[in-house]
Amino acid sequence: MKQLKLVLCLAALGNMLTGPFLGSSYSAVRLSMPFAVIDTTNCAPNSPTVWFAASNGDDGNDGKTPQTPMSVYGATHTALPGHRICFMGGTYAETGTFYPPRSGTPSAWIVYQAYGDGPVNVVWTPTTLACPPAGTADCTMVNAVPSSGNSYLEFRGFTFYGQGLAGDAFGCNNSHHLRFIGNTVYNVQGAGVGAVQCDYLVSDHNIVYHSGYSGTTASWTSGISYNQIKAFDCNDGLHNVISNNIAVGQYDNSPYHSDGSGFILDMNATPSACAGTAAPYEPAALVSNNVAYGNGGRCAEAFQVSFFWMMANNTCYINNLDNVNANQANTGSLSTNAANNGYFADNISVSWQASNPPYDQRNTNTNIQYFANLAWGGPCWVDPDGSDFCANNPQFIKADPRFAAAPYFDPTAAGQYAPAAPPFLLANGLTPQPVSPVYCQGVDPTTLPGVPAQVAADMQNAGNAYYIYKDFKGKARPGAGGCWDLGAYQH
């Protein structure tokens, strides 16, 4: 989203004070979506740090067991730093934005998670809230803002149904240290995760499907968007991560038709200063192991960012489907636009049409490096002359990746982002076959020349294995014999 947007209205403030969830379950949702497999061992009954919540919970209960859950309001306002709120399976009707009531601390995060007995379906059902396009209320489903709980929070295993009316599923505005893990987002106006001037974010193993169709500026974003990243501190290591997510059917139906991508690092027009200095400091970001197909916009883009960033082991298949508008007609899949200091390593990018480059560089970019990528479906493109920088470049394999059962897209039909096959039907469709040219062609991206030492060390940290050293499904990378495959799946 190419603008800073933070709208807090009195109607939303009322939700902060009374809670945005109805006390009874809403009617059944219409689309069967997957839910994350949740480790319930952390939801131990009768623990002093665990609270249970349910759509029909009662604050007269003690909230200490699955049989005695509190309401969402009661449990979330009772939890303290270091506590965990475990949500029982069910459907939760959300009538307005949920603002976490308090922050955790660096050593004691607050965790919101599905208990694991069934999907936790959060369904946007506002009654009087004036959401776009009719109004300008903050219609984000969960929003971390400085006026309430905004840091050291984790959200895990929820399914959000935006009904085409909610803004973003998760919002972050001038906040820091947030984790969004294993969530599913369907049919919001904006992003699955939409962050503006935030830092230390992790978005991992989420699904964002069929969002951005509202026709308002709320749609001027992408599946997961980190906008104007603002440094919380001057640590030289890895700050922000987008990993192991699936984005499908994203669409920018705003008047601009410039976004609708799977993932974006978007604008650092206001770089932060290191504490005690006037020098701008821009924290490092990683986009890895993601899958994007059937989107109206790009697979992933770095737009006007100049901090160190890397896109590694992503699988991009048939994106750029919103070709009606001039802003999208010839854009690339893995794209830089007025960006600097970026690495592309071990990616697979397959174009829909030859006019949509698998990789492109728009406007003036500097220090963009490529290592062991596959490009297929069309020539690459660099401004101003449109030359194919992938041709005759040993860092690119120009071949069909030979996927097992890739989703079908018509080679010319418009609007195919809307009916793109949902991710729970994908199965192993974008895993390479044994004859694929991507087997054993990759490199360990942490060892590439010029990667900042502390960033490499953070990516190599065993606690961060899912970012680099495990594939999308958790298989160890490298595989047998030191084999490192391209794309999100290791054979």
Question: What is each stretch, according to the model?
Answer:
Residues 1-41, 490:
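Enriched but not universal
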Residues 44-45, 53-99, 436, 473, ...:
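Acidic Gly/Asp/Thr-rich repetitive segments characteristic of extracellular carbohydrate-active
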Residues 55, 86-95, 103-168, 398-401, ...:
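Right-handed parallel beta-helix/beta-spiral solenoid domain characteristic of secreted/periplasmic
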Residues 87, 112, 150-155, 178-180, ...:
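All-beta strand scaffolds that present successive hydrophobic residues in beta-strands
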Residues 88, 113-115, 156, 161, ...:
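Feature marks extracellular polysaccharide-active and adherence modules
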Residues 95-100, 126-145, 164-172, 187-196, ...:
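Extracellular beta-strand/beta-solenoid scaffold signature
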Residues 95-101, 107, 247, 275, ...:
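Predominantly extracellular beta-rich ligand-binding scaffolds that present long acidic/polar faces
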Residues 394-491:
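C-terminal accessory segments
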